[in-house]
UniProtKB/Swiss-Prot annotation:
Belongs to the WD repeat LIS1/nudF family. Keywords: Cell cycle, Cell division, Coiled coil, Cytoplasm, Cytoskeleton, Microtubule, Mitosis, Repeat, Transport, WD repeat. SUPFAM superfamilies: Lissencephaly-1 protein (Lis-1, PAF-AH alpha) N-terminal domain, WD40 repeat-like. Dimerization mediated by the LisH domain may be required to activate dynein. The gene is nudF. This is Nuclear distribution protein nudF. It is found in: Cytoplasm, Cytoskeleton; Cytoplasm, Cytoskeleton, Spindle pole. Gene3D superfamilies: 1.20.960.30, YVTN repeat-like/Quinoprotein amine dehydrogenase (2.130.10.10). Residues 9-41 form the LisH domain. It comes from Aspergillus niger (strain ATCC MYA-4892 / CBS 513.88 / FGSC A1513).
Length: 443
């Protein structure tokens, strides 16, 4: 016990035990303990009475704390069950989440006064943030279809949004043409808790390096990528692309790599640790609007498209990349720079891309007002087109995907179809934003 307690804590415990035994007239036990615990004669009857009741108080206090912990654990389990039940996952609606694709919209949110440029889902709650050229951010309950609040702070159009931060302390990051990045705290009614300054031109995109991380990545038309520690507000690294405008940035799932795309028509792959470019993806004939790393769940399909005999290990986070551009095409790449497929079908600028968490589909939006779904298991064939909005579709995001749903490498990862799949724990919900000033939810 004395190895766990400090000397003063141990002394207090010994005296409390002696005082308790004295109060119940166990005099022989008191004498033995005084000798064994080496409590000197200065601890007389008057001092002993000051310690009476202390042991009982601590004992009952521990019992109350144990009961409170059990009650809180039970309450937490109940809330988690309620959350899992309320959230309209494909599983809860009897659908197959691996093959789920959006159909008609469930909600249409209309409150912005100008084009919606970006959307982002809260990782835990049914909250959705949308940013607009009207310089505001709006927070919606996408489950109930209600507007919760409007955030004002940016002086020019909001360019991008992302939720992140350490577990239990989620932060919303926003960026704008006003050259600033703002951090908003959902736990404080979305108060603007910090403003990050440093870019010399419009900030195009923000992404947290990992879902539960304090590191934020920003990309700008000043041709730089900045890495920020949101807990301090300091810029910890600047990467100079030595090129032109950067329109988009996307981190790999482990946070070790970045892909950027912009005005020079090339996508670049960067190693975060060294801040060096490791590959250039050259092939588009106009500005690149969006870029994203493929999840490991899609590796087997992309490996087949690339003509590889075996898929890369699922533990690798940066094997394949998709880019979309103003040349109306989507290109699929090996991250080392080899073009493996060009997807043609959109009739206008491609503005947003995401991979289905199940790995089978790539979903895109464009200024042709549509959402298009491409089946990677069929070589990237266009299998579905949805007329999503009445004007340009500017952005798309998938609902929260638990980190545990990203597969890990096993010895059979390239042989077993079971190990290649993602556990269907993700929510099948998509949000889009449009130049028609609306946000739509597809479930």
């Amino acid at each position: 016990m004395t190895k766990i307690l400090t000397s003063s804590q141990a002394e207090e415990l010994h005296k409390s035990i002696i005082a308790y035994l004295s109060s119940i007239n166990a005099s022989r036990s008191c004498e033995v303990l005084r000798e064994e615990l080496q409590v000197d004669s200065s601890f007389d009857d008057a001092l002993c009475r000051k310690y009476e009741g202390l042991l009982e108080k601590k004992w009952t206090g521990i019992a109350r704390l144990q009961k409170k912990i059990l009650d809180l654990e039970s309450k937490l389990a109940g809330l988690q069950t309620e959350l899992d039940t309320i959230s309209p996952t494909a599983r809860s609606t009897g659908k197959d989440p691996i093959n789920w694709l959006p159909t008609s919209s469930r909600h249409t949110f209309e409150s912005h006064r100008d084009a919606v440029t970006c959307v982002a889902f809260h990782p835990v709650f049914t909250s959705l943030a949308s940013g607009s050229e009207d310089c505001t951010i709006k927070i919606w309950d996408w489950e109930l279809g209600e507007l919760e609040r409007t955030l004002k702070g940016h002086m020019r159009p909001v360019s991008d949004l992302d939720f992140g931060g350490q577990k239990g302390h989620t932060i919303l990051a926003s960026c704008s043409s006003d050259l600033q990045i703002k951090l908003w705290d959902p736990n404080k009614d979305y108060a603007n808790v910090r403003t990050l300054s440093g870019h010399d031109h419009s900030v195009s995109a923000v992404r947290f390096l990992r879902q539960t991380d304090n590191i934020l990545i920003s990309a700008s038309r000043d041709a730089t990528i900045r890495i920020w520690d949101v807990s301090t507000g300091y810029c910890v690294k600047v990467i100079d692309s030595q090129g032109s405008w950067i329109n988009d940035v996307s981190p790999s799932f482990d946070g070790k790599w970045l892909v950027t795309g912009g005005r020079d028509q090339a996508a670049m792959v960067w190693e975060v640790a060294s801040a060096k470019s490791v590959a250039s993806l050259i092939g588009h004939e106009n500005f690149i609007e969006c870029c994203v790393f493929a999840p490991p769940s899609s590796y087997k399909h992309l490996a087949a498209i690339a003509g590889l005999k075996t898929a890369p290990p699922a533990s690798s986070s940066s094997e394949f990349i998709a880019t979309g551009a103003r040349d109306k095409t989507i290109k699929l790449w090996e991250s080392r720079g080899r073009l493996i497929k060009t997807l043609v079908g959109h009739d206008n600028w491609v503005r947003g891309l995401l991979f289905h968490p199940g790995g089978k589909y790539l979903i895109s939006v464009a200024d042709d007002k549509t959402i298009r779904c491409w089946d990677l298991s069929q070589g990237g064939r266009l299998v579905k087109t949805i007329n999503a909005h009445g004007h340009f579709v500017s952005c798309i995001r998938w609902g929260p995907v638990p980190v545990s749903d990203v597969p890990v490498e096993t010895s059979e990862s390239t042989k077993s179809s079971k190990s290649d799949s993602v556990k269907p724990g993700f929510q099948c919900v998509i949000a889009t934003g449009s130049a028609d000033s609306s946000v739509r939810i597809f479930t």
